[in-house]
A protein has these predicted regions:
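Extracellular loop-to-transmembrane helix junctions
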Residues: 9, 33-134, 248-251, 443-449
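Membrane-helix boundary/coupling elements in multi-pass transport proteins
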Residues: 64, 73, 96-114, 221, ...
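Membrane-interface loop-to-helix entry segments
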Residues: 139-190, 245-250, 372-385, 411-415, ...
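Terminal cytosolic tails of multi-pass membrane transporters
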Residues: 1-12, 390-411, 431-500
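Transmembrane helix-loop boundary segments of multi-pass membrane transporters
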Residues: 36-42, 46, 110-111, 124-136, ...
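N-terminal small/polar loop signature for handling phosphorylated ligands or for N-terminal nucleophile
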Residues: 551-604
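TM-loop-TM module centered on a large, flexible mid-protein loop between adjacent transmembrane helices
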Residues: 79-81, 86, 118-123, 129, ...
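Helix-loop-helix junctions that connect adjacent transmembrane segments
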Residues: 3-8, 47, 123-139, 168-298
Length: 604
């Protein structure tokens, strides 16, 4: 198995990946479905239902967290399932998740202009035609296509640009949500809660009502899986990536629960019934009642529109990276692995998915509802396969470094498989309430046939290269397993070492390097004194992040300065020596007049 240096730029911060995951999960549902949730389970019953659903997804999220930190490569599910199940399992898993992403992107393109009609009823102008009972208007079509083009353009311009857009919109969503919650506390009344805390007139019917909410909630948490798709672009310690993924799920559960409580506190059962019979936007009407102003309902709808765009943006990021990873493994045409020369984004994959989102509104909203339901089925199938991969890899690769290592993996893995398998079953079993209708099965079947065609054609075209996988090298320190000593522990051990230090003589060697390299052992704080015999200007060589974040680099640099030795930094070392450009470092040393090298870390 080969290794290569990542072609992506590491531009995503911890905040970026948090808002990408959270924004993907918080779409339009909290605006349009809250009344239905309360009607099914009652206010507190719906909150408990979301908590149960969150726990179901939480176990799946734990498997993702461990695998993403262990294999931080573009494609996420593609890499996990490849290592566990081989190329065929990887193809099925990744192709399924791509269906989920593409369908969501296309659906959001239609959802946005539809919501504008709630704010401006006269928005629809220029009737064109009708598809499956849905009327297509020129104004509706124009807005959908223009926004689809804009979001695709933003993503092509760079991952960081897309993350910035995500941050702005997520802050707006959070702000609107906080306004509703605070206003409901001020303007609401506990008497509104009393008659609608729970649905059902007995313990058994109440529990059944709560579970009716719980079984539908996992579908509102789809989106946290976007994080592993862009793992190569994340500039965050690997262990923290897993933590952020879990945090995003917790925040989504909390957001939904607080919105339900806010609506229930300010709206009586009769208010909710009237709202559902009218606009159907119970949350927006709750906002208007809390502020005693109809304008505030439109403010909340704007927040819902931001939720549509954050989901859209996140799934476009995820879908394009998943396609890139399949093309990288010769499973689909190689053209989809092309990166933009300047922005380092998978440009051809973005062109395709973005193009589909621009064309999607032509087919109307009803047809895209069928597609997105089929896509959700694909996401749940991928979740189940990733959960299985988690268990398989604990047996198959126990020695794999796992920066974020889940405890009690057997329990977590089995529960994750059961939970995700349950979600898949809900789409398959007739009468479950979420089962696919014939049109949706046709969509899923068509996607499966397209996948089979790609599989056969690429297998014949690329032959033995089909399904090949290339690992991406990462920094040594970043992949340290949980059981290993931490970098800080190692540094402490060095600082408390014996005072007697053996300095080994310099070793000269020929590697086309115009400098001498000295290897020596000693305490960090004595680096300057140890370096004195070998030169007057040092090149400090280290990896990308760990030495600087731990403070080791600062200690070495200060020691050199105290000893009167100038120094410059070369921090482009990767884990795999074959991917580290030695000549680049040598040229840098020569250009800066360095006559000694101080290397920090094993990779250096």
């Amino acid at each position: 198995m080969e290794k290569k240096k990542s072609e992506f730029d590491k531009v995503f911060s911890a905040w970026d990946i948090l808002v990408i995951a959270f924004g993907a999960m918080i779409g339009w549902g909290w605006v349009v479905s809250t009344g239905d949730w309360i009607g099914r389970g009652g206010v507190l019953g719906a909150v408990i239902g979301f908590a149960i659903g969150g726990i179901m997804v939480f176990f799946v999220g734990l498997t993702y967290a461990e695998l993403t930190a262990a294999m931080p490569q573009c494609g996420g599910e593609h890499v996990f399932s490849y290592k566990a199940m081989g190329p065929v399992g990887s193809f099925i898993c990744t192709w399924a998740i791509i269906l989920g992403y593409v369908s969501a992107v296309c659906f959001e393109a239609c959802a946005l202009p539809t919501i504008i009609t709630y704010i401006y009823p006269g928005f629809l102008k220029g009737y064109l035609y009708t598809v499956a009972g849905f009327d297509i208007y020129a104004s509706w079509l124009a807005v959908a296509m223009i926004v689809a083009f804009f979001i695709t353009f933003i993503n092509i311009k760079g991952a960081k640009t897309a993350a910035t857009l995500q941050t702005v919109l997520t802050v707006i969503i959070g702000g609107v949500g906080i306004l509703l919650i605070v206003a409901s506390v001020v303007s609401g009344d506990a008497s509104n809660l009393t008659p609608q805390l729970f649905a059902g007139d007995s313990a058994s019917t109440t529990m059944k009502a709560i579970m009716s909410v719980a079984v539908m909630t996992p579908f509102f948490f789809i989106g946290f899986d976007v994080i592993p798709q862009a793992a190569e672009e994340i500039n965050v310690p690997l262990k923290k990536i897993g933590m952020i993924m879990i945090l995003s799920i917790v925040l989504a559960v909390a957001f939904y629960a607080l919105i339900i409580l806010g609506v229930g506190y300010v709206m009586s059962p009769s208010d909710i019934s009237s709202s559902q019979a009218g606009s159907g936007l119970v949350t927006a009407d709750a906002m208007a009642k809390a502020f005693h102003s109809s304008i505030m309902s439109k403010v909340l709808i704007v927040g819902g529109m931001c939720g549509i765009v954050t989901s859209w943006n996140s799934f476009l990021i995820g879908g394009s990276r998943a396609m890139y990873s399949m093309a990288e493994s010769y499973m689909i045409p190689r053209t989809f692995r092309k990166l933009h020369k300047t922005h380092k984004t998978p440009v051809n994959a973005l062109y395709l998915i973005g193009g589909l989102s621009i064309l999607a509104p032509l087919f109307g909203r009803k047809m895209l509802v069928w597609i997105v339901d089929a896509g959700n089925f694909g996401c749940c199938l991928a979740y189940c396969m990733v959960s299985l991969s988690f268990i398989i890899l604990r047996k198959k690769a126990p020695e794999m470094a796992r920066p974020y290592k889940v405890k009690h993996y057997k329990i977590v893995g089995v529960l994750a498989v059961l939970m995700s398998g349950f979600m898949v079953a809900m789409y398959i079993i007739p009468g479950s309430g979420s089962n696919l209708v014939p049109q949706e099965w046709a969509m899923a079947g068509g996607w499966a046939v397209l996948g089979i065609i790609f599989f056969i054609v690429c297998k014949l075209k690329y032959k033995e290269k089909f399904g090949s996988h290339i690992d991406v090298a990462v920094d040594d320190e970043d992949i340290t397993s949980e059981e290993d000593h931490t970098f800080e522990d190692a540094l402490g051990a060095v600082n408390t070492a014996e005072n007697v230090v053996e300095v080994q003589p310099a070793i000269n060697f020929n590697y086309f390097l115009p400098v001498n390299i000295a290897f020596g052992s000693g305490k960090v704080l004595e680096t300057g004194e140890l370096t004195k015999p070998y030169g007057k200007k040092a090149l400090i060589v280290t990896g990308r992040s760990s030495a600087k974040k731990s403070g080791l680099y600062d200690k070495v640099a200060n020691s050199l300065s105290k000893a009167g030795i100038d120094h410059v930094l070369f921090d482009k070392v990767a884990q795999n020596p074959l991917t580290t450009t030695a000549m680049e470092g040598a040229d840098f040393a020569k250009a800066n007049g360095c006559d000694v090298v101080v290397a920090i870390g094993g990779g250096s």
